[in-house]
């Protein structure tokens, strides 16, 4: 079977709480780093989440 093009990534909270979401992204169509506003349940606010690699 062929290797999939989608890469697993981690979206880490910029609030510094350590909270993160995991998702996948197509590295061929979106080579830049993802930045999304999502809800951080630790601070109970919508904050910016930035892409980081899953180790």
UniProtKB/Swiss-Prot annotation:
InterPro entries, A to Z: Ribosomal_bL33, Ribosomal_bL33_CS, Ribosomal_bL33_sf, Ribosomal_zn-bd
Is Disulfide bond set as a keyword in this record? no
Query: Which key words are in the record?
Result: Ribonucleoprotein, Ribosomal protein
- For the keyword Ribonucleoprotein, the answer is yes
* Cellular-component GO terms for this entry: cytosolic large ribosomal subunit
PROSITE patterns on file: RIBOSOMAL_L33
Known Pfam families for this protein?
Ribosomal_L33
Query: Could you tell me the Gene Ontology terms of the biological process aspect for this record?
Result: translation
Superkingdom classification of source: Bacteria
Query: What are the GO MF terms of this UniProt record?
Result: structural constituent of ribosome
Tell me its family. Answer: Belongs to the bacterial ribosomal protein bL33 family.
Q: What is this protein called?
A: Large ribosomal subunit protein bL33
| Organism for this UniProt entry | Cronobacter sakazakii (strain ATCC BAA-894)
Its lineage reads: Bacteria, Pseudomonadati, Pseudomonadota, Gammaproteobacteria, Enterobacterales
Its gene is rpmG
